[in-house]
Amino acid sequence: MWRGFGVLLLMLLLLSSNVWARTDTLLYPLKNIPLLSGNFGELRATHLHSGLDFKTEGREGLPVICVKEGVVARVKVSATGYGNALYLEHEGGITTVYAHLSRFSPRVAKVVRNIQYNKESFEVDENMLGYELRFHAGDTIAYSGNTGSSGGPHLHFEVRDTKTEHVLNPLRFLSVKDQTGPNVRGVYVYPVSNEGLRTSPYRVEVKNTGNRVFRGGRVCVPAGRVGIGVQSDDYMKDSWNKLGVYDLSVSANGREVFKMIMNELSFDQTFLVNELKDFHHYRDSRLVYLTFGNYQEQLLSVCNQDRGFILVEKDSVVDVVVDLSDINGNRSKIMFQLWGKFPSLEWGLAEGEKLLMNHQSDSLKKGKYTLWLEADALSHPFVCKSVVYSCVRDSVETIEVFSTGKQIYPLMKSARLQVSGKFPEKSVICLLEKNKRFSALKTRWTEEGLEASSRVLGEYTVRQDTIAPVILYMGRAGRKIRFRIADDLSGISSYRVEVNGKWCLFTYDAKNRLLEGNINEPVFVKGKNRLVLKVEDAVKNIAIFETDIYKK
């Protein structure tokens, strides 16, 4: 087993050295060396962060520059996700990505606009290599913004391997000022059964004893397997934003059982984010790295031995050392002991509970509700109790709920949920979120009833969506024409603006529910123009707004 782990570790180190060998210095994508608000490989809600987030002084419109001579390979415009995004290919086999842009440079914008009108669509995703739009290092290629799912003005920047499309750590190509090792906020020990069940973790109290060495003394735990969780973050010079950890390793009695170096990621692995973080701690705003798991070795940046678990024999003591460092080599160390003082935990099921194994397919059935899980949908075995109950919402309405547990549990593969029976037209399956809010799932009608896919276990109900989207005309502000559009349940699926019977380009900002057009679009003529806006939701409720727009 050790030989296999050694091979994996060697591969990880070779991968790291290959990245070093192939790197060349890039310019920063903003003219002044900017501060980071997010770094590569950070643990996010649904993914591992694939690039760097650069601060833009809290505003939009800063020039974004080409970091190395290259050609525009792709342009994507979306109301969500990356928003306005530009992809450039460069010599040396790398592609750089610039996202959440407010607008493109004039050369690019002209081509994109023509594509949008040809396709009659604001959202486009176009291969641009045929247009031969080449830029030199230092050229302005776009302007920073807040488009897509951005939570505030910033520039998201990525470096990718052009051939594999793997994302590479951009800090391998850029020099950064950082002289302090990662912070240690807490350490947790998770007892794990032979079946892989986890209990609530023990917290290890650690103190900084100087030189960024944190000591935690001796921790009494049940005999058996345990996993280690590390609550840590990092800072860079002149920035107070919490960043992710670059290098993290765990050793037990001098034997390395876990190693993470955030050099390279694949988009196929984004679902594994919950293999590296404690999901429930994350929901409580605590970033805890898990150094054990059944599927971590699928990540390009991780290798472990015995899945990162540490075996603590009864009455034995295990010395644990956790090493952390940033990309500049600034280090922190945690040292503590595990004492197998208590007997092994007894694991059992309460009445009505069911043990779901991660490597097996399974199903949960209660009344008219059936939920199917594929093998490897769960990251680890999970005890579940499925029930159907009624609850009162808003002191008025009683709803029926199918529950797999009060806490949401993330899945690595989507579960399939079927609700049997006859339902009113335009019914949808919804996930019941905090405060009894509904989040509609994409629902299919079948001979048996309704069916939907879900990436979490939680609580579900069925709702009928008979209300059309809401359109609010906000009037004109100079050349701008603005609308707010919203839907209360199934969500907006499409919109279309026509002026004088012809399609007109309106940008859509989904997070702010904002539609915006310009009276200088070519379909507007002098004098009176008839504008018609049609908005449709996911169950085909339609709202239409018509007005006259006058252009001088």
Task: Outline where the language-model segments fall.
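Proteolytic processing hotspots in large secreted/extracellular or virion-associated proteins
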Residues: E346, N358, S386-I429
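Short beta-strand elements
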Residues: N328-A350, F545-K552
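Short, solvent-exposed loop/turn segments at the edges of extracellular beta-sandwich modules
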Residues: S325-N330, E536-N541
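Conserved structural position at the C-terminal beta-strand
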Residues: S232, L324, L533-V535
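Surface-exposed, glycine-biased beta-strand/turn segments
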Residues: W20-T95, S102-R107, S121-Y131, H136-A137, ...
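Exoplasmic/lumenal beta-rich domain surfaces
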Residues: T95-G130, L197, V206-G217, S251-L311, ...
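Surface-exposed, short loops/turns at beta-strand junctions within beta-sandwich domains
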Residues: L311-V317, S454-V456, N520-K528
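Proteolytic cleavage junctions
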Residues: G348-S363, I408-Y409, K422-V428, L432-S493, ...
